[in-house]
């Protein structure tokens, strides 16, 4: 049994992998104030679903928030008898080369996404991860060849709210029309629809530039309630990043 952590900017996804299935929970940044407090939160979550902590043999971690890594690692060392593995580009997993200017700068979440994509969807895949930032990651010929980073929906809406005097903070929703008749509609159309249209155009241009078709896979918390309403991707995989953490950790354990 594996315990997995996808540490993001807005929240951390905690996952248990057992018998080919994932159980997941979200915890907020305040959960990482101390190693003891973090253990209480994690153990309570696992106890609710009758997970025997002694049967967990591996902890895999993808983190884009370095300042929580120490507390997380210390908690695991103190309370779990597990091998702890952090995701990074140092080890070549699934024979993926990172053909970019600075491979060490590629985020752990993006590494996990391309590893999972290659494992499950093939050598030519575009991964879209809708979170605090929207990442576009391109796997071509089985290697990571680049991508893009875009402000996430909540990030963009939050920026409008914090930097203007009268614009409200609105929920993430896709209006059925393209001309807003009130402020909320205007923001939703302006932020969400134009972002999605921009990503769709970007994907088309990547395909044209590389002269290749790609399977498009989406993941991320902000996509869970929009996946049935848009068609810019072929697959929605809510566990894509966790799968990547799992594949990475198991391969490292073999070394």
From Swiss-Prot:
Binding-site list for K(+): 129
Localization per Swiss-Prot or TrEMBL: Cytoplasm
One Gene Ontology biological process: coenzyme A biosynthetic process
GO molecular function: ATP binding; metal ion binding; pantothenate kinase activity
Active site per UniProt: 109
Binding site for substrate: 107-110, 183
Associated pathway: Cofactor biosynthesis; coenzyme A biosynthesis; CoA from (R)-pantothenate: step 1/5
Transmembrane region(s): none
Keywords: ATP-binding, Coenzyme A biosynthesis, Cytoplasm, Kinase, Metal-binding, Nucleotide-binding, Potassium, Transferase
Family stated for the protein in its record: Belongs to the type III pantothenate kinase family.
Complex and partners: Homodimer.
Protein name, per record: Type III pantothenate kinase
Protein species of origin: Petrotoga mobilis (strain DSM 10674 / SJ95)
Name of the gene this protein is made from: coaX
């Amino acid at each position: 049994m594996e315990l997995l952590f996808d540490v993001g900017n807005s929240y951390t996804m905690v996952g248990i992998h057992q018998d080919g299935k994932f159980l997941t929970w979200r915890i907020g940044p305040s959960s990482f104030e101390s190693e003891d407090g973090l253990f209480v939160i994690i153990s309570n979550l696992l106890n609710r679903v009758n997970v025997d902590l002694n049967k967990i043999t591996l902890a895999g971690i993808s983190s884009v928030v370095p300042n929580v890594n120490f507390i997380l690692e210390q908690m695991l060392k103190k309370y779990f008898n597990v091998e702890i593995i952090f995701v990074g580009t140092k080890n070549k997993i699934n024979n993926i080369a990172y053909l970019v200017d600075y491979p060490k700068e590629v985020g752990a979440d993006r590494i996990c996404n391309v590893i999972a994509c290659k494992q499950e969807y093939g050598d030519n895949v575009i991964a879209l991860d809708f979170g605090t930032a929207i990442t576009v990651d391109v796997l071509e010929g089985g290697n990571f060849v680049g991508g893009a980073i875009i402000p996430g929906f909540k990030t963009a809406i939050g920026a409008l709210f914090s930097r203007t005097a009268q614009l409200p903070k609105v929920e993430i929703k896709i209006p059925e029309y393209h001309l807003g008749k009130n402020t909320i509609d205007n923001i939703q159309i302006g932020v969400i629809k134009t972002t999605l249209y921009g990503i769709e155009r970007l994907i088309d241009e990547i395909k044209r530039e590389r002269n290749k078709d790609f399977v498009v896979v989406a993941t991320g918390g902000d996509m869970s309630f929009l996946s049935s309403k848009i068609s810019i991707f072929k697959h929605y995989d809510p566990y894509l990043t966790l799968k990547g953490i799992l594949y990475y950790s198991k391969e490292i354990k073999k070394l």
